[in-house]
Amino acid sequence: MSKVSGANETLQGALAPLSHMGGGGDATLLKDEGQVELPRGPGVLNVQVLPEEGHAHLQDLEGYKSMDPRQSESASTDVSEMLQHTASLDDPIQFTRVSTSSVTSNSSSDPRESGDTQETGSRRGCSTEEQAPAGAERVSGQDQDSWDVEEVVAEPRSGIDVTPVGDVTNSTIRASGRSAESTSHYLDEYSDTRYSSSSPSSGSRKLSTTIITPEKNVVAQALHCYADNYESPLNDLMSSGDERSSSVRETSFENASSDTNANLNGGRASTGESMRSPPPATGLPNGFVHTQASAPALPVLPAKSPFRAVQSPFSGTRKSRNSANLAELSLPRTSTSSASSMEQRKSRGGRMKVVLSSFVQNIRRNSQGEKRRSGTAMKISTPYNATHVHHVGVDSRTGEYTGLPEEWERLLASSGISKKEQQQHPQAVMDIVKFYQDVTGTSGEDKVFKTFNVSSTNACELSSSPSFKTPSLSSITRFEGSHEAYNSAYHSPMLQSPMGFHDPQHDEKFIPSRPAPRPPGGAAPKTDFTSPLAYDSQSATATPKNQRFSNQSSGFFSLARKATLNKNKQQLPPIPSAAAASAPITQPGSTANIPYIKPAENPVSAPSKSIPPSLPAVPTPPPPIEKDPPLRDLEREREREHSSAKQGQLALERKREEKRRRNQKLQAKLAEICSPGDPSKIYRNLVKIGQGASGGVYTAYEIGTNASVAIKQMNLEKQPKKELIINEILVMKGSRHNNIVNFIDSYLLKGDLWVIMEYMEGGSLTDVVTHCILTEGQIAAVSRETLRGLHFLHSKGVIHRDIKSDNILLSMDGNIKLTDFGFCAQINETNLKRTTMVGTPYWMAPEVVSRKEYGPKVDIWSLGIMIIEMIEGEPPYLNETPLRALYLIATNGTPKLKDADSLSPVLKRFLSWCLQVSPNDRATAMELLYDKFIVEVAEANASLAPLVKLARMKKLAEKMDADSDDNRTD
């Protein structure tokens, strides 16, 4: 509701004080409601507060036109008569829309039910103190002071905007673009609004409202009076006005005449705010001015424009058509509240919330639109580099394996493991499959399954001690550390560990097993024994590590045992490795190629492969419009191939660079380990007695002492795992023992490594067990010396992991020493168990085959198998295929002897203690050294000397027989 405040002045001849009315006043006002034609322009007038008890009806005022829609008759007196002496201004008055629909809907359409009678008394008591005197002088156009027009502006609390469309009574005031909700909220917010009436005895009715002055006592008195009388009944009638200054609400007064516009001329108080000219309001027959003030009154200055501009919430098309005839009211702006700053902050906070909410919604809408656009444009190509992963399982109903690759099925079929055995021990077969997967799962050089006798060279071709053999591709491994001396000087990542050895599981391979004799009718190639100084590159051809060498000085002929002769009849099963495609596997002792099975492609094991095996098939759609997507797919595929090729090339270059740096570090470390000089000037009479995968083995005599030594020459370029060599050298350097082959010295000459070791001219134990029969005393002697060497290694935390007859060397006087430490590994307190797959499968312990943790007792199991080898001439399951041998080791546990009744109980007890399936029940090296079989039955080492000589003569006889056969064939 609006109120008009004049400085002790009233409107001339038109306005009179409102008379106090009782309840009957409401009925008088209601009867004429509905006959008034409200303007359709945007304006606000709160009509609820007019028909109050004790106040004069507005319809009785002269020149006042009621805003009630039910008012049928207009007032008799025109406002133009009231303002006939006032000067006209050129600037139009700013109008806002007036809506009464929200007022009448929320309060009451019937004044009798509106509850106005409850507010009349309190209003009457408060307003009489502030009303203008009845006999005040009338205002002339020249002497008129400023009129303060306040506007009650409704701000919806619930955020619901009441549209004025279609409602002829909708004339709620809207300021700053806000919609009105209900009149019930107006007076609650504007608690400083006062309505008063003059004495009813006055001749003419006057509209007197609260005088707004900058004096603090008047404002405080008015607020106090209103708080006592109006705060309670008007709690719900609040609204916010202008957001920038809400301390003083200014109202606009509408002229009742639609064709006569009165202009009020007055001064405007400067408030420190920039004054803006209001835009012309159109669409209203009468003008409203909406101004505000938020600062105390200051001295009046000449005003260029008497109105402060208020932006209309309506578009320009809805402005009043009569704006040209509107006059402008000059209104002073004053401040009546000290709480304006707080309300300003609240208003600014609300505005900021609206801005931020709109900003967030726009961002969300844009992001959703981008997602929809990107989702429609995205296309998924067909898979490339696809691989099929096999999951091997066992059918519980049929007992058959499911998910086996085709090559594995053929491997099992050729391994000799029957269906019945597979059904009886499915888990064991699964372990064997995993075993093969682990062995063949590596890539590159390590993906060569040369575990067993897969050589095209005759077993009788060369003769040498196994200690002179270099590790081949099949005997490649890493170790989790090195010796203490090596660990303190060298810090290669591949050789670091708590104890120095680095031993990743996936690099472990089988050690070659016993070779088979040459096939019938096959001629063994002749061997030329030359000095290493005249050694050329052709002499470094790859020869398997399992070659048995005979001494050149042997001139006796002998025949191999029958059991060993049968080994040439068996062929290895096809091996599912990638190397099989490029290097066909040959039968031991023959040159015939064995068909291989092409393994399933595994891109994980070959990351350098950049081009997919095949491009996805491009369909040929009949419509021409569908040709573009396949072309785009092909283009993308080509781009992927190109990028993959680049990535693969970069990866290959990085790998080569890393390998080069690693080789440089290994070369530097070898240079530190090796002694400077030329071994050809220190040793004389070098004679080649054997050939390894990466070099040859020679015998020589030291100049000055005439001591016989063995020289192991290795071409480092052909040695794929140089850390193995370093490991073996360091282990031998730190293992000075009577039962360990002693390391003498090493040299690095022109890229070749020369290792000088103690020479065991008697050869290996393999020559003895294959050509001679040992007694229990001799078996006990060999076991004793082996146990002493193992006890020494185990005390150092070293596991040999490859105890077999090939790695037991004898001298001519019968002394026994361990050799071939290329596969040894160290353990410590933090790593007491190992899980790597290493060693020769026929001598493997069950825990190794089953991929369980193991410790030093795996060497004790291998010793037990070696004892069976000394008893029967070969290890158990040697005539079986390797896969079936592993299966039998895992399922049978302790192997059975062919003629156990011929053995003494002491030997059987000792053997049973070594071959316990459970490592916890298996004996240690120290316990076995105190066993009765070792203490009482073992003979002296000299008892082995005749066997060594006999084995050498038989081996030489076999070689001479082979040479004669070759001559007859030629």
Curated annotation (Swiss-Prot):
Positions with biased composition (Basic and acidic residues): 625-644
Composition-biased stretches (Low complexity): 98-109
Segments of this protein annotated with the region Disordered: 1-42, 86-185, 236-284, 311-351, 499-551, 592-663
Location within or outside the cell: Cytoplasm; Nucleus
UniProt biased composition (Pro residues): 613-624
Superkingdom of this protein's organism: Eukaryota
Reaction catalysis annotation: L-seryl-[protein] + ATP = O-phospho-L-seryl-[protein] + ADP + H(+); L-threonyl-[protein] + ATP = O-phospho-L-threonyl-[protein] + ADP + H(+)
GO MF annotation terms: ATP binding; histone H2BS14 kinase activity; MAP kinase kinase kinase kinase activity; protein serine kinase activity; protein serine/threonine kinase activity
Compositionally biased tracts (Polar residues): 1-11, 168-185, 248-264, 312-325, 536-551
Protein kinase domain span: 683-934
Protein name in the entry: Serine/threonine-protein kinase STE20
Originating organism: Eremothecium gossypii (strain ATCC 10895 / CBS 109.51 / FGSC 9923 / NRRL Y-1056)
